[in-house]
């Protein structure tokens, strides 16, 4: 060991027995206090390393590789001690049974994370946490490697493990940074692509190996390891889109969203009954032209964050910062987003800050305690989904979820987040009986911590990612969901109009002969249509679990089902509010959605299905081109009833107005009986052009209508001096516009 011959020197070379015993048992709370370089009491240094299964270790000079001496193995197998005459950068030359390894000593590096990073994390306000915690490919003191950092404040010991250390938790125990509870270590010479997990010693022993909550990449399920990922290596080409995005997201702009599940939109058949999911690059080639043809302004992806169980559709996810490996690499996903933007299609992600699954490799009992979740099951266990609820009242968890949102918006150029299950976050008694929930500090049912989080989220997103959107799936009458936080609201850009969805679908499911008794189901939404900024959603939730597909909800024979569907979609596209339609509904898929199968594309050989698809394309085109259909969605003056009470005929008629005073007339006949000579007031005299007839032949309808154009008559109706006399096709919607000279 070449140690100086001084009294006590040998004693200082070997740690105290209690420390050595704790290290061997992998229970030492501060391995840096005994491993690595330490002063010898004079001008030199002892170097200690614990390398179980190593045969021998030599010290080399880092600058030129010359040999500095051999490290002696102590009485404890694997514990080596060497001596340096004076402090200097060194390398460890380790002889293993399988070969030789030369590396820097992980325990020769000082504290890694800056005090400001730790402070902001503890405060719950670190805006770029995905570049701080987790596995960061970096350089420390000129040495390339990976810095690991994980929050586990109640752990007795945390080690990073992987194939690089034979998954041996004794090899790389980490340093705890008090008082934040973050553990860190720099492992030299590690490369992107290596897999890893954390081995955590809790109060009651070693826990199941844990995936990294901050992982930027993962292995393909059912494997559960995290994967080291370099900073996103992608050259973006969407600057024009980003510059124009804020204008595209104004409440006066058209917003038409195509919701899809990336893995089951289309698949490739590789063998009989064997299907392969497309990766992001392949999906871009197929999906983007299709969405462009149909005229949607945005797509909305069901959660693409890594999730262990495919049957959860992504809503029970564990990697809030990593795209699932099912469809390729993080760079592949960036390519997909960039390609969408270059085609002028926005990308919205479903995002889940409400709950997470109980998988043992995940967040549950992460350090042996309820760290991310509430400790009391009355607060922390979601009975509907058998999941755990994020404790957003804890600043670190609050900041963790806030950083996840910003990660997708900033690193992946995502245009908006649709926040899942907001209602379950707002109420402590959500889906709970009396005695099964805990009140807030004021004795109420509101979840004050979640409310604070949602308001903070929306304020921070507006500041850090201007021009993006945050949309709430919120199913209750909570007031001010889309009101600014400064006015007491939650601050979302939009809220899903679940009331419209339920009422309108219930109306459409009625046999037309009975619809007159349920007339208000279709008109009631106009009572509150401007109480929030709404998105009208026909989402995946409406075409699963025995609810039937959208077309299969419709009553009648085959012809009537298609006519009802076309009328419903036309009503939806002319109703105030932005639009969202789930994949398959745009061509009338009969089968409920199944995440294990692609859509039934073979249906496109039938005229009725092609007709529905053509209608959706034309509705989107009109919706974008006609300002009256989108400009005043949030302004009640942009809508005017003409006929809302004709329950005997099940006819609805209304005007949509643009900011410059141009109207569109919408007339819906929700029975299979043609209505001849139906008189409606007209705000402008002259010819009115039939922009759309959902019964047109091009949509596989009966082609009953008005010949494309109608002249007003000098006959008062509905408070107007002139009127139109129209033939209303069966189960159909007409859209008319005054003809300009």
Swiss-Prot record:
InterPro entries: A-amylase/branching_C, Branching_enzy, GlgB, GlgB_N, GlgB_N_E_set_prok, Glyco_hydro_13_cat_dom, Glyco_hydro_13_N, Glyco_hydro_b. The active site is at 420 (nucleophile), 473 (proton donor). Monomer. CDD domains: AmyAc_Glg_BE, E_set_GBE_prok_N. This is 1,4-alpha-glucan branching enzyme GlgB. It is an enzyme of class 2 (transferase). Its EC number is 2.4.1.18. Keywords: Carbohydrate metabolism, Glycogen biosynthesis, Glycogen metabolism, Glycosyltransferase, Transferase. One of its GO terms (biological process) is glycogen biosynthetic process. GO terms for molecular function: 1,4-alpha-glucan branching enzyme activity; cation binding; hydrolase activity, hydrolyzing O-glycosyl compounds. GO terms for cellular component: cytosol. It catalyses: Transfers a segment of a (1->4)-alpha-D-glucan chain to a primary hydroxy group in a similar glucan chain. Coiled coil: none annotated. Pfam families: Alpha-amylase, Alpha-amylase_C, CBM_48, GlgB_N. Pathway: Glycan biosynthesis; glycogen biosynthesis. Disulfide bonds: none annotated. Belongs to the glycosyl hydrolase 13 family. GlgB subfamily. It comes from Pseudomonas syringae pv. syringae (strain B728a). Catalyzes the formation of the alpha-1,6-glucosidic linkages in glycogen by scission of a 1,4-alpha-linked oligosaccharide from growing alpha-1,4-glucan chains and the subsequent attachment of the oligosaccharide to the alpha-1,6 position.
């Amino acid at each position: 060991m070449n140690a100086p011959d001084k009294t006590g020197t040998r004693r200082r070379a070997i740690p105290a027995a209690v420390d050595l015993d704790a290290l061997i048992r992998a229970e030492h709370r501060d391995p840096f206090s005994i491993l690595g370089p330490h002063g010898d009491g004079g001008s030199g240094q002892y170097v200690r390393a614990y390398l179980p299964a190593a045969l021998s270790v030599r010290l080399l000079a880092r600058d030129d590789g010359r040999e500095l001496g051999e490290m002696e193995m102590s009485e404890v197998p694997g514990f080596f001690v060497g001596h340096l005459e004076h402090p200097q950068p060194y390398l460890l030359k380790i002889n293993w049974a399988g070969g030789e390894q030369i590396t820097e000593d992980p325990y020769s590096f000082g504290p890694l994370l800056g005090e400001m990073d730790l402070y902001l994390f503890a405060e719950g306000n670190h805006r770029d946490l995905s570049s701080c915690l987790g596995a960061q490919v970096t350089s420390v003191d000129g040495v390339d490697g990976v810095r690991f950092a994980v929050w586990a404040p109640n752990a007795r010991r945390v080690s990073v493990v992987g194939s690089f250390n034979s998954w041996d938790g004794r090899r790389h125990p980490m340093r705890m940074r008090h008082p934040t509870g973050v553990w860190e270590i720099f492992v030299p010479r590690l490369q992107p692509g290596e897999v890893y997990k954390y081995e955590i010693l809790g109060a009651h022993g070693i826990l199941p190996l844990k995936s990294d909550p901050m992982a930027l990449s993962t292995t393909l399920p059912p494997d559960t390891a995290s994967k080291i990922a370099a900073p996103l290596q992608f050259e973006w080409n969407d600057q024009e889109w980003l510059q124009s995005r804020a204008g595209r997201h104004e409440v006066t702009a058209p917003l038409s969203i195509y919701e899809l599940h990336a893995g089951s939109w289309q698949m490739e058949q590789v063998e009989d009954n064997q299907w392969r999911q497309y990766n992001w690059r392949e999906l871009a080639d197929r999906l983007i032209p299709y969405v462009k043809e149909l005229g949607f302004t945005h797509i909305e992806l069901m959660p693409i964050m890594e999730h262990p169980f495919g049957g959860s559709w992504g809503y029970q996810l564990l990697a809030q910062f990593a795209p699932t490996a099912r469809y390729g690499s993080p760079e592949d996903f960036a390519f997909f987003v960039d390609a969408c933007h270059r085609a002028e299609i926005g990308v919205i992600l479903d995002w889940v800050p409400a709950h997470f699954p109980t998988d043992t490799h995940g967040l549950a009992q992460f350090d042996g305690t309820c760290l991310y979740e509430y400790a009391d099951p009355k607060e922390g266990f979601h009975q509907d989904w058998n999941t755990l609820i994020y404790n957003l009242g804890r600043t670190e968890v609050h900041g963790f979820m806030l950083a996840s949102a910003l990660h997708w918006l900033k690193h992946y150029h995502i245009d908006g987040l649709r926040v899942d299950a907001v209602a379950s976050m707002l109420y402590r008694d959500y889906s709970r009986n009396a005695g099964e929930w805990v009140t807030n500090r004021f004795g109420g049912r509101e979840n004050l911590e979640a409310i604070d989080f949602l308001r903070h989220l929306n304020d921070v997103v507006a500041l850090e990612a201007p021009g993006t959107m945050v949309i709430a799936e919120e199913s209750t009458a909570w007031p001010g969901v889309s009101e600014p936080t400064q006015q007491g609201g939650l601050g979302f850009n939009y809220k899903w109009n679940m009331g419209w969805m339920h009422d309108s679908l219930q109306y459409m499911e009625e046999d037309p002969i009975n619809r007159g008794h349920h007339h208000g189901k279709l008109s009631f939404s106009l009572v509150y249509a401007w109480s929030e900024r709404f998105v009208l959603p026909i989402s995946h939730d409406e075409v699963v679990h025995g609810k039937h597909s959208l077309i299969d909800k419709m009553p009648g024979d085959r012809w009537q089902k298609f006519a009802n569907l076309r009328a419903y979609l036309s009503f939806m596209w002319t109703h105030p509010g932005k639009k969202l339609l789930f994949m398959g509904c745009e061509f009338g898929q009969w089968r409920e959605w199944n995440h294990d199968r692609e859509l039934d594309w073979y249906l496109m050989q039938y005229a009725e299905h092609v007709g529905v698809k053509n209608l959706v394309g034309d509705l989107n085109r009109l919706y974008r081109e006609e300002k009256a259909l989108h400009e005043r969605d949030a302004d009640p003056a942009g809508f005017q009833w003409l006929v809302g009470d004709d329950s005997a005929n099940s006819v609805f008629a209304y005007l949509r107005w643009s900011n410059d005073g141009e109207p569109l007339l919408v007339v819906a006949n929700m029975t299979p009986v043609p209505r001849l000579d139906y008189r409606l007031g007209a705000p402008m005299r002259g010819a009115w052009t039939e922009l759309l007839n959902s019964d047109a032949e091009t949509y596989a309808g009966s082609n009953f209508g008005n010949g494309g154009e109608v002249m007003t008559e000098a006959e008062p109706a509905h408070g107007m001096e002139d009127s139109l006399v129209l033939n209303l096709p069966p189960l159909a919607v007409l859209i008319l516009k005054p003809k300009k000279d």
